[in-house]
Amino acid sequence: HEIKDKIRNELGFTVNVGISTNKLLAKMASDFEKPDKVHTLFPEEIPTKMWPLPVRDLLFLGKASEKKLTEAGIHTIGDMAHAREVEIQTLLGNKAGHQLWQYARGIDDSPVRAQPEEAKGFSVETTFNDDIVSVEQVLPILLEQCDVVATRMRRKEKKCTSVSVTFRTLD
Protein backbone atom coordinates (compact mmCIF):
# COMPACT_ATOMS: atom_id res chain seq x y z
CA HIS A 1 0.00 0.00 0.00
CA GLU A 2 3.00 2.28 0.47
CA ILE A 3 3.48 3.13 -3.23
CA LYS A 4 -0.25 3.64 -3.79
CA ASP A 5 -0.50 5.95 -0.77
CA LYS A 6 2.62 7.89 -1.76
CA ILE A 7 1.17 8.57 -5.22
CA ARG A 8 -2.10 9.77 -3.67
CA ASN A 9 -0.36 11.97 -1.07
CA GLU A 10 2.35 13.47 -3.30
CA LEU A 11 0.66 13.62 -6.69
CA GLY A 12 -2.97 13.91 -5.66
CA PHE A 13 -4.53 11.08 -7.63
CA THR A 14 -5.53 7.51 -6.92
CA VAL A 15 -4.22 4.32 -8.47
CA ASN A 16 -5.32 0.73 -8.32
CA VAL A 17 -2.71 -1.95 -7.75
CA GLY A 18 -2.98 -5.54 -8.90
CA ILE A 19 -0.57 -8.15 -7.56
CA SER A 20 -0.04 -11.59 -9.08
CA THR A 21 2.37 -13.98 -10.77
CA ASN A 22 1.92 -12.57 -14.30
CA LYS A 23 0.89 -9.35 -16.05
CA LEU A 24 -2.56 -10.61 -17.08
CA LEU A 25 -3.60 -11.61 -13.57
CA ALA A 26 -2.14 -8.43 -12.04
CA LYS A 27 -4.12 -6.28 -14.50
CA MET A 28 -7.30 -8.29 -13.90
CA ALA A 29 -6.78 -7.83 -10.13
CA SER A 30 -6.29 -4.08 -10.49
CA ASP A 31 -9.69 -3.84 -12.22
CA PHE A 32 -11.66 -5.68 -9.50
CA GLU A 33 -12.77 -2.69 -7.45
CA LYS A 34 -11.98 0.99 -7.82
CA PRO A 35 -10.82 3.53 -6.83
CA ASP A 36 -7.64 3.45 -4.76
CA LYS A 37 -7.50 -0.27 -3.98
CA VAL A 38 -4.95 -3.08 -3.84
CA HIS A 39 -6.06 -6.55 -4.95
CA THR A 40 -4.41 -9.90 -5.55
CA LEU A 41 -5.23 -12.57 -8.10
CA PHE A 42 -2.95 -15.55 -7.62
CA PRO A 43 -3.44 -18.78 -9.60
CA GLU A 44 -5.21 -20.49 -6.70
CA GLU A 45 -7.69 -17.55 -6.52
CA ILE A 46 -8.73 -17.75 -10.20
CA PRO A 47 -11.75 -20.07 -9.65
CA THR A 48 -13.30 -17.80 -7.01
CA LYS A 49 -12.23 -14.33 -8.15
CA MET A 50 -11.93 -14.46 -11.96
CA TRP A 51 -14.06 -17.30 -13.30
CA PRO A 52 -17.40 -15.90 -12.04
CA LEU A 53 -16.83 -12.66 -14.01
CA PRO A 54 -18.62 -12.10 -17.34
CA VAL A 55 -16.50 -12.86 -20.43
CA ARG A 56 -16.53 -9.14 -21.33
CA ASP A 57 -14.26 -8.54 -18.30
CA LEU A 58 -11.47 -10.70 -19.73
CA LEU A 59 -8.54 -8.55 -20.79
CA PHE A 60 -8.33 -8.03 -24.59
CA LEU A 61 -11.75 -9.56 -25.28
CA GLY A 62 -13.80 -7.12 -27.37
CA LYS A 63 -17.51 -6.66 -28.05
CA ALA A 64 -17.58 -8.79 -31.20
CA SER A 65 -15.88 -11.71 -29.41
CA GLU A 66 -18.19 -11.30 -26.42
CA LYS A 67 -21.21 -11.55 -28.71
CA LYS A 68 -19.93 -14.74 -30.39
CA LEU A 69 -19.17 -16.36 -27.04
CA THR A 70 -22.48 -15.48 -25.38
CA GLU A 71 -24.41 -16.67 -28.44
CA ALA A 72 -22.58 -19.99 -28.01
CA GLY A 73 -23.63 -20.17 -24.35
CA ILE A 74 -20.30 -19.03 -22.89
CA HIS A 75 -21.18 -16.27 -20.45
CA THR A 76 -18.44 -16.25 -17.80
CA ILE A 77 -14.67 -16.42 -17.88
CA GLY A 78 -15.05 -19.77 -16.12
CA ASP A 79 -17.31 -21.06 -18.91
CA MET A 80 -14.58 -20.10 -21.36
CA ALA A 81 -11.81 -21.66 -19.27
CA HIS A 82 -13.71 -24.94 -19.06
CA ALA A 83 -14.60 -25.05 -22.76
CA ARG A 84 -12.44 -27.05 -25.13
CA GLU A 85 -9.76 -24.86 -26.70
CA VAL A 86 -10.83 -25.92 -30.20
CA GLU A 87 -14.36 -24.65 -29.46
CA ILE A 88 -13.03 -21.19 -28.57
CA GLN A 89 -10.76 -21.22 -31.64
CA THR A 90 -13.72 -22.11 -33.87
CA LEU A 91 -15.64 -19.13 -32.49
CA LEU A 92 -12.82 -16.55 -32.39
CA GLY A 93 -10.19 -17.80 -34.85
CA ASN A 94 -7.12 -19.92 -34.17
CA LYS A 95 -4.73 -17.25 -32.87
CA ALA A 96 -7.19 -15.10 -30.88
CA GLY A 97 -9.06 -18.17 -29.66
CA HIS A 98 -5.87 -19.79 -28.36
CA GLN A 99 -4.69 -16.59 -26.65
CA LEU A 100 -8.03 -15.75 -25.02
CA TRP A 101 -8.61 -19.36 -23.92
CA GLN A 102 -5.21 -19.26 -22.19
CA TYR A 103 -6.06 -15.91 -20.60
CA ALA A 104 -9.33 -17.35 -19.27
CA ARG A 105 -7.21 -20.00 -17.55
CA GLY A 106 -4.84 -17.35 -16.13
CA ILE A 107 -1.95 -18.24 -18.44
CA ASP A 108 0.20 -15.33 -19.68
CA ASP A 109 3.84 -15.92 -20.54
CA SER A 110 4.57 -12.39 -21.75
CA PRO A 111 7.74 -11.03 -20.15
CA VAL A 112 7.87 -8.04 -17.82
CA ARG A 113 10.28 -5.55 -19.36
CA ALA A 114 12.06 -2.78 -17.47
CA GLN A 115 12.26 -0.71 -20.67
CA PRO A 116 9.46 -0.67 -23.25
CA GLU A 117 10.28 -2.05 -26.68
CA GLU A 118 10.53 0.47 -29.49
CA ALA A 119 7.30 0.70 -31.46
CA LYS A 120 7.33 -1.16 -34.78
CA GLY A 121 4.76 1.15 -36.29
CA PHE A 122 2.99 4.45 -35.95
CA SER A 123 -0.77 4.74 -35.89
CA VAL A 124 -3.63 7.07 -35.17
CA GLU A 125 -7.34 6.40 -35.01
CA THR A 126 -10.54 8.34 -34.61
CA THR A 127 -13.98 7.23 -33.45
CA PHE A 128 -17.00 9.05 -34.82
CA ASN A 129 -20.42 9.48 -33.27
CA ASP A 130 -22.06 9.25 -36.70
CA ASP A 131 -21.26 7.07 -39.70
CA ILE A 132 -18.98 8.55 -42.36
CA VAL A 133 -20.78 8.13 -45.67
CA SER A 134 -18.79 10.16 -48.20
CA VAL A 135 -15.24 10.81 -49.36
CA GLU A 136 -15.78 14.51 -48.65
CA GLN A 137 -16.32 13.70 -44.97
CA VAL A 138 -13.34 11.41 -44.57
CA LEU A 139 -10.69 13.25 -46.61
CA PRO A 140 -9.93 16.10 -44.16
CA ILE A 141 -9.81 13.63 -41.26
CA LEU A 142 -7.49 11.31 -43.17
CA LEU A 143 -5.17 14.21 -44.06
CA GLU A 144 -5.06 15.32 -40.42
CA GLN A 145 -4.23 11.79 -39.28
CA CYS A 146 -1.48 11.51 -41.91
CA ASP A 147 0.00 14.75 -40.63
CA VAL A 148 -0.04 13.48 -37.03
CA VAL A 149 1.73 10.23 -37.99
CA ALA A 150 4.23 12.02 -40.25
CA THR A 151 5.11 14.46 -37.46
CA ARG A 152 5.78 11.59 -35.04
CA MET A 153 7.91 9.78 -37.63
CA ARG A 154 9.97 12.89 -38.40
CA ARG A 155 10.54 13.48 -34.69
CA LYS A 156 11.89 9.92 -34.35
CA GLU A 157 13.75 10.16 -37.69
CA LYS A 158 11.89 7.14 -39.06
CA LYS A 159 10.82 6.17 -42.58
CA CYS A 160 8.17 3.74 -43.69
CA THR A 161 7.83 1.19 -46.45
CA SER A 162 4.05 0.85 -46.32
CA VAL A 163 0.95 2.74 -45.24
CA SER A 164 -2.28 1.08 -44.18
CA VAL A 165 -5.72 2.65 -43.75
CA THR A 166 -8.48 0.75 -41.98
CA PHE A 167 -12.16 1.63 -41.74
CA ARG A 168 -14.28 -0.19 -39.20
CA THR A 169 -17.93 -0.25 -38.28
CA LEU A 170 -19.47 -1.36 -34.99
CA ASP A 171 -21.28 -4.12 -36.88
Regions found by a protein language model. Name each.
Residues 1-99, 151:
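Gly/Gly-Pro- and Ser/Thr-rich, intrinsically disordered tail segments characteristic of DNA damage-repair
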Residues 65, 70-171:
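DNA-contacting surface of Y-family translesion DNA polymerases
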